């Protein structure tokens, strides 16, 4: 089986991609391998619990949020091909190499509310080309279609790296020697599914199309959908999307009525865009219920969006309900 270091040069050459772009991916992987070691030790390393700080979104940070964020920043700044960074945990962008060609955006530890109870978490990342001119916030505000690469690392029973350069999706598993080994090529998400993932406790706050959709799923084979559905909810986007990649399903984090000014909870740049690129490469769909996720023009680094992604039949049906 191919290791990442053997696979990557050949993949880059086959698809006429720059070696430096592969080097940025390897820097991300190096950082994630270090984060994995911290996650694995947990309480033994004294990294669990709250950090006593908050991020720009007003969320309390876990110790591992801060540790993972610092590891990502330090590792990526050491790569001269990286011009700038943007993190869910930072107020604004971070300057890196003066002559760098690439921008890296990331959620250093997705699902960190699960850390203290030993449930799967992960790191999500996106790589963009730096536009000409001085680095500014606007440099990062590119649509998801402009991503050069996207991926995530799942820290679960196995530690797995999943990424795409826009030429298929590849999955690698970390072995005992701390090497990522290719374990699956080009997974395809089934068009139809019988699984959905949503936080049902928020049902009373959802907009009518989402309430209708969930009611139809819960009605099962005697309802309009004509089949029984199972619900899943891990509260870790990386874990949810990984399951969908492996066996299908639809993941939803809709807008709700509590704060009309907030179109959703998840971040377009750090979570929705990279996951959408991966899923589209695997034959799935992703939208905010009104347009394809990858076509949304970002307005700010920390922009939030409603998220519907997974098996294409379900995402298309949700889009139709919202269009009524």
Curated annotation (Swiss-Prot):
Native source organism of the sequence: Neisseria meningitidis serogroup B (strain ATCC BAA-335 / MC58)
Q: Which PANTHER family match?
A: FRUCTOSE-1,6-BISPHOSPHATASE-RELATED, SEDOHEPTULOSE-1,7-BISPHOSPHATASE, CHLOROPLASTIC
Q: Which Gene3D superfamilies match?
A: 3.40.190.80, Fructose-1,6-Bisphosphatase, subunit A, domain 1
Q: Which GO terms describe its biological process?
A: fructose 1,6-bisphosphate metabolic process; fructose 6-phosphate metabolic process; fructose metabolic process; gluconeogenesis
Q: In which pathway does it act?
A: Carbohydrate biosynthesis; gluconeogenesis
| Residues the record lists as binding Mg(2+) 2 | 107, 110, 271
Q: Which residues bind substrate?
A: 110-113, 199, 265
Keywords for this entry?
A: Carbohydrate metabolism, Cytoplasm, Hydrolase, Magnesium, Metal-binding
Write out the similarity annotation: Belongs to the FBPase class 1 family.
Where does this protein reside within or beyond the cell? Cytoplasm
Its GO CC terms are: cytoplasm; cytosol
* Name of the gene this protein is made from: fbp
Q: Which cofactor does it need?
A: Mg(2+)
For binding Mg(2+) 1, which residues are annotated in this chain's numbering? 88, 107, 109
Q: How does it assemble?
A: Homotetramer.
InterPro entries noted in UniProt? FBPase_C_dom (IPR044015), FBPase_class-1 (IPR000146), FBPase_N (IPR033391), FBPtase (IPR028343)
Chief localization: cytoplasm
| GO terms for MF | fructose 1,6-bisphosphate 1-phosphatase activity; magnesium ion binding
What is the name attached to this protein's record?
A: Fructose-1,6-bisphosphatase class 1
Q: How is the cofactor bound?
A: Binds 2 magnesium ions per subunit.
EC top class, as a word: hydrolase
Q: Which residues cross the membrane?
A: none
Catalysed reaction(s) here are:
beta-D-fructose 1,6-bisphosphate + H2O = beta-D-fructose 6-phosphate + phosphate
Q: Does the keyword Metal-binding apply?
A: yes
E.C. no: 3.1.3.11
